[in-house]
A protein has these predicted regions:
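Conserved RNase H-like, two-metal-ion catalytic cores of nucleic-acid enzymes
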Residues: 1-58
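Active-site flanking residues adjacent to catalytic metal/cofactor-binding acidic residues
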Residues: 2-4, 66, 99
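Short, low-complexity, polar/charged sequence segments that are solvent-exposed and flexible
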Residues: 18-21, 40, 82-85, 117-118, ...
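Metal-dependent phosphoesterase core characteristic of DEDDh/y 3'-5' exonuclease domains
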Residues: 30-31, 68-192
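Conserved short-loop catalytic and cofactor-binding motifs
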Residues: 39, 64, 172
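Short alpha-helical basic/polar micro-motif
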Residues: 58-61, 182
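Proline-aspartate-enriched helix->loop->beta-strand connector
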Residues: 60-68
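Acidic catalytic cores of enzymes that act on phosphate-bearing nucleotides/polynucleotides
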Residues: 189-207
Length: 207
C-alpha cells in the first residue's frame, strides 16, 4: 500500500511532505506487515525516488490504496512535472495492478448523492476502530495536516535549530501515516470478508 501527506490537495499549490509504503504478505498476520515512512529532507523528487524505490523493491503483485488513483499518484506526478524531475513510478502503480478501494465507493456515492466515504468511516462500518493521532490538543485530520502540521514540518528544513523540533514532528507524522497505511490494508481484507487485527488500529497517540 501507499499513502502520501501533503500541504494541499492541488499539486499546483501544495507540496509533498511524506510518503509511506506498506508491504504485506497475505499468508501472514497483518501485524507482520512492514512499513517505510519517507520524509522531506531535501527535495520532493528525492523523497519520491526513495519511496518508489522501496515500493518497486517489494516486488508485490498488487498495490492497494485508498484514493491512490484519484489523488495520491496524480499529485506525485503533478509535483514531479512542476519540478521538471524525472522519477519513474513502478509498474505496480498503474492499473490493473493498482487496486484503489475508493473508486467504487466514490462511484456509488455519486450515484446516490451521498458524501464520499472516508477511510475511517469505511473501517468503522466493519467494526474496526481507526487509529487516532492527536496533535496540539485536537485530532489530526487531512485538513489540519495540510494547513498546520505539514507547513510546520517544512519550516524546520534547512535549519540547525529546527532539527530537534523536526524530530518530534516526524513522530507525529509517522503515527498518522502508519495508521493510514494499516487502515488501508485492513479495509482491503475486510472487503474480502477477512477479519484482521493490526498494530495501529484503535491506537491513539497524543503530542
Amino acid at each position: 500500500t501507499l499513502d502520501i501527506e501533503t500541504t494541499a490537495t492541488d499539486p499546483a499549490d501544495g507540496e509533498l511532505v511524506s510518503v509511506g509504503v506498506g508491504i504485506h504478505d497475505r499468508a501472514d498476520p497483518l501485524t507482520e506487515a512492514t512499513y517505510g515512512t519517507f520524509h522531506r529532507a531535501d527535495g520532493e523528487a528525492s523523497l519520491v525516488d526513495r519511496a518508489m524505490t522501496r515500493l518497486a523493491a517489494a516486488d508485490a503483485d498488487t498495490l492497494v490504496t485508498y484514493n491512490g488513483r484519484g489523488f495520491a499518484l496524480p499529485f506525485v506526478e503533478g509535483r514531479l512535472d512542476r519540478l521538471g524531475a524525472d522519477v519513474d513510478l513502478p509498474i505496480i502503480a498503474s492499473p490493473p495492478d493498482h487496486l484503489d478501494l475508493f473508486r467504487d465507493r466514490k462511484r456509488r456515492a455519486d450515484e446516490t448523492g451521498a458524501a464520499w466515504p472516508t477511510l475511517e468511516a469505511c473501517l468503522e462500518s466493519y467494526g474496526h476502530a481507526p487509529p487516532k493521532t492527536v496533535w496540539r490538543g485536537a485530532p489530526l485530520t487531512n485538513g489540519r495536516f495540510g494547513e498546520e502540521l505539514g507547513p510546520a514540518y517544512l519550516r524546520t528544513l534547512g535549519t540547525e535549530t529546527g532539527a530537534r523540533f523536526r524530530a518530534s514532528l516526524t513522530e507525529v507524522v509517522d503515527h498518522y501515516l502508519l495508521g493510514d497505511l494499516e487502515a488501508t490494508l485492513a479495509l482491503y481484507y475486510a472487503d474480502l470478508g477477512e477479519s484482521v487485527a493490526g498494530t495501529y488500529l484503535g491506537t491513539e497517540r497524543r503530542s
